[in-house]
Amino acid sequence: MVYSYTEKKRIRKDFGKRPRVLDAPYLLSIQLDSFKKFIEQDPEGHYGLEAAFRSVFPIQSYNGNSELQYVSYRLGEPVFDVKECQIRGVTYSAPLRVKLRLVMYDKDAPAGTVKDIKEQEVYMGEIPLMTDNGTFVINGTERVIVSQLHRSPGVFFDSDKGKTHSSGKVLYNARVIPYRGSWLDFEFDPKDNVFVRIDRRRKLAASVILRALDYTTEQILDMFFDKVSFEVQGKSLVMELVPERLRGETASFDIEANGKVYVEQGRRITARHIRQLGKDGVDQIEVPVEYIVGKISSRDYVNEETGELIAAANQELNLEILALLSQAGHKSIEVLFTNDLDYGPYMSETLRVDSTTDRLSALVEIYRMMRPGEPPTREAAEQLFNSLFFSEDRYDLSAVGRMKFNSSLLREETTGSGILDHSDIIEVMKKLIEIRNGRGEVDDIDHLGNRRIRSVGEMAENQFRVGLVRVERAVKERLSLGDLDAIMPQDLINAKPISAAVKEFFGSSQLSQFMDQNNPLSEVTHKRRISALGPGGLTRERAGFEVRDVHATHYGRLCPIETPEGPNIGLINSLSVYARCNSYGFLETPYRKVVDSKVTDQIDYLSAIEEGQYVIAQANAALETDGSFSDELITARQKGDSGLHPRDHVQYMDVATNQVVSVAASLIPFLEHDDANRALMGANMQRQAVPTLRADKPLVGTGIERSVAVDSGVTAVAKRGGQVQSVDASRIVVKVNEDELVPGEAGIDIYNLTKYTRSNQNTCINQRPTVMPGEPVARGDVLADGPSTDLGELALGQNIRIAFMPWNGYNFEDSILVSERVVQQDRLTTIHIQELSCVARDTKLGSEEITADIPNVGEAALSKLDESGIVYIGAEVKGGDILVGKVTPKGETQLTPEEKLLRAIFGEKASDVKDSSLRVPNSVSGTIIDVQVFTRDGVEKDKRALEIEEMQLKEAKKDITEEFQILEGGLLARVRTLLLSIGYSEEKIASMDRERLFALTLDDESLQNQLEQLAEQYDELKAEFDKKFETKRRKITQGDDLAPGVLKIVKVYLAVKRRIQPGDKMAGRHGNKGVISKICPVEDMPYDEKGQTVEIVLNPLGVPSRMNIGQILETHMGLAAKGIGDKLNEMLKQQQELHKFRNFLQKVYDLGDTRQDVDIAALSDDQVHTLVQNLRDGLPIATPVFDGAPESSIKELLKLGDLPESGQLKMFDGRTGDMFERPVTVGYMYMLKLNHLVDDKMHARSTGSYSLVTQQPLGGKAQFGGQRFGEMEVWALEAYGAAFTLQEMLTVKSDDVNGRTKMYKNIVDGDHRMEPGMPESFNVLLKEIRSLGINIELEDK
């Protein structure tokens, strides 16, 4: 296996046995590809902005004299880059400019004669852009648009499963769902009539819609029924016979032909009888005249002579009618073929309940149903009916809908019109009746072939179209007003509605969510989330059990494990690792093709619909070296059911063992040994892990950590290979390899790192370089680690030495006992950054001012502010300290004589302002790490703002100059190489300055051209950098665009260091969560025979009932991994030769029957040295999901690390020194500190705000509320008989307004008595009873 430069520094031992066929795809592609489709120009106009424009334009005026045509669009450049947008609190977006053409026709000339054409580019608002990491910056905060899983457009056949009607009869229905437009439902009622509903309104007989399509009763019967014809021969009737139709019926007369009786009267007709009739070629039989009674006429029968109607179509026949027919000379009579078994008379019955008779009455009926109360006219009724399903403006099935519609009706072609036609409606009704007749199946709406993904691009396109449609109306009216000669396209278009629609979607849609930025995994997972909620989706309350359940088609598409606990369970899912979206929006998953029982490397992506046709083997099926199956019978899936199949039946095979699960679940080692419920918690809790101060890679991982860290975008990744030229804390410079250069560029890549910035969840984002100057790097190598990454691998927690044993009750009920050493070493210390802002506004009484001159504030409180009244960077502050001094003008009040005197002495200024400074919240303390000042255009900047501006300019200049010098150095190096190649000496070149070098004249023309080209590049580069600096300078110095009425905003960033403490929540990766109960001194912790203490003690009772055995295996494996590291340390101490290290490492990497092939001999001595140094803390191990290390391998590894194979050690009590009576399971587990910190939850209230109505204290920390003393707590006090305590709780401590003010006074006076009064909530109760019309009064006795 080939390792990149970064991977060679620390090679993870992989226990996976199945060969890697397909690497995990780029994890954010679902977001990026979708948005790319939206903004990229599509010449076909099938999707994106192009499709939206084409669907609305051209817009014609009502009189048809002019039209506005769309030509093309382009997106401009964003004004600010992503980082600037985040700092300034603005949206990262680009202006959309559309080229429109206004065409005016000559109304006097023949139609279509053009009078005038005007073309112009029109601004149509801003389109938010996606960052490289798949997020949007909206008003300065990073947001994610979650993809939606919704019901695919098309036609669905379903039944009520017998739940609607009391008889339990199953009622079938069909529903045509368009992408946009009216829904069309057909349904059976308990009497077996077919009804139609439009948009779920009042139902009409289904034949109404057929009549509205201009079909007569005769034509309708013709479409839905087979016919039987009878010949009148004298006194008897001869019926044409189709033997198949007789199956299952009981003969009401002898069936005979040619003198042979086939079935006697009263006997049931069986398949044998039918075969016999067919064999003898019987196609006619004589039937008694009574047989036709009750049959239904298929057409109108008229007396030719008199013109009188004898029998109408759909009329029941009787002997009287038969006699009349015979008299009128009708020798042949056609009736409908129906029976009770599989040819029901449904449509015929429906026609009987239908009150309409012709097209007009049907249209009027539909109009009345859609627009009740409006008087129908013929034109209005026709226009409404046509616009429902037959107009492209109002109705669109979409490409997906048409494809699903056609495949559901078993048609060959997958494409077609977006609107319905007559045959579509008729075929849907026919199929519904077929299903009712027992032929055909209903659809499963939870099948992933019937649910599709709507991603960012598609949702944004829909919103954009909504905005355009709003504009369309205004344009039409404006075009019809006349006087178009002076008008240009931009006068017609108002961009506001478009901007508003787009802004509303990105800012406040249910699917536009504040990004979960706890750690890189939570970012990736949030972008790969699939929600069934949101506009056009389900609601929590209506979603039943079936929708939430795992479906067989989720396999390899949606993760069966990762979903939230609580009301959203099953409605919010996560994409599986390898899943992708196809062009129709259905989820696909990859499979390896099997040809002649041999697995090939050809990979096919199959959607849920396609997958149903194949037999698919699991990824762990045993294979021979040539790729053929080892076993005769293979465990495989077909149509969602697992079973054993002969190997020659298998057509596909899974690509990887972790194909089924999502990214978070595939990060759990030994997942296959955990119960699903706990795995769900484990996957969810990894997303809540806070990045620790020093990231620590997991000793026991699954091998997917690297791709998560790289794809999440928190690390700096090399765009091209090369050599690291220089590294400092904030920048890495790479000189690009010659073969990766674009001709004519300097060949230097510069990576600027992010330092100590705040994430959405107030955690700290900071990047640290992982490379050294001079190191070679390849494309895709990790150059700098971000939060929670270690050498390019995801590192959410810390490897901690743990023991499973009870310890003095401190680990009762999942509590966790932690050693003081963990705190001392800052293993689980995290940095949190808070942003506090202070806004100075223009008020009615005058403008607020940011100043250090604050009334009634002592010198000490101002000690941390500078002269502008803003706290300085580096100051350590605690709750209540002033960060930004601000004064607000006060309204005029009645002055006391003393104040009047002060005014007279000191002038006006003494008391007309009040202190409204920004202070540190009560429970917070920390260090100021940054201050930003934003000043409105036209407002004078204060000294601090100017200082910050100057510093930013200096930094920008330094950055740009350094960047320029690096690139200039690159260019000059190429000039030097050029001159050296034609014989110039090093000294001579060194003695010449840049101007002289570029001014040289060379004899060789091609070299001269090259030199001139380099000189030209230098000039271009200089001009580009000057322009870059000028742009940067303008951005820094110009005033800021602030909200109306805001003069100044000061943002202060406060960093808080949080050590682990009792009350913090921690968890492993297997759903084993707990709260820290005690931080125990190191000397009291249990220790082993070597004197090594454990750092955390967990309760062994947390394992058996939870069935997450994975944690035990991880602990053993962790011990073995650490043992290898300890052995390497021992060898280093003994200063053993390098070849011994090579041999030992080779032995370690070769252990077990695995796919990994590490050749230590191929590494250089330096690389081996780096590898050994990086393995001293322990050997990182990968045990892939469902392909993990077996027990035997763990034992072998423990043996190699000189540890007992049981994984259990003899332990001693730290307090007494006594040995525990049996060996204890000790090892290393990866523990996470979750973002549920006691500091954020701890809260106490003395007095505070009260609710307006009930006068009771508010609830919650944010409102500084009280603790609710509820019903059950009252019972507890009643049980104790604590009457006075209870009285105090229900009155003065809660809502007895007079009592509590009196109590306050009494306490101030040192008198601790209380006088309870009437609780306010009693008055509320009285008022509520009175509002019900019951007069209730309290009588004082």
Swiss-Prot record:
InterPro entries: DNA-dir_RNA_pol_bsu_ext_1_sf, DNA-dir_RNA_pol_bsu_external_1, DNA-dir_RNA_pol_su2, DNA-dir_RNAP_su2_dom, DNA-dir_RNAP_su2_hyb_sf, RNA_pol_bsu_bac, RNA_pol_bsu_CS, RNA_pol_bsu_protrusion. One of its GO terms (biological process) is DNA-templated transcription. The keyword Transcription applies. It catalyses: RNA(n) + a ribonucleoside 5'-triphosphate = RNA(n+1) + diphosphate. Its EC number is 2.7.7.6. The keyword Transcription applies. Coiled coil: none annotated. One of its GO terms (molecular function) is DNA binding. PROSITE patterns: RNA_POL_BETA (PS01166). GO terms for cellular component: DNA-directed RNA polymerase complex. Keywords: DNA-directed RNA polymerase, Nucleotidyltransferase, Transcription, Transferase. SUPFAM superfamilies: beta and beta-prime subunits of DNA dependent RNA-polymerase. It comes from the Bacteria. It is an enzyme of class 2 (transferase). DNA-dependent RNA polymerase catalyzes the transcription of DNA into RNA using the four ribonucleoside triphosphates as substrates. Belongs to the RNA polymerase beta chain family. This is DNA-directed RNA polymerase subunit beta. It comes from Photobacterium profundum (strain SS9).
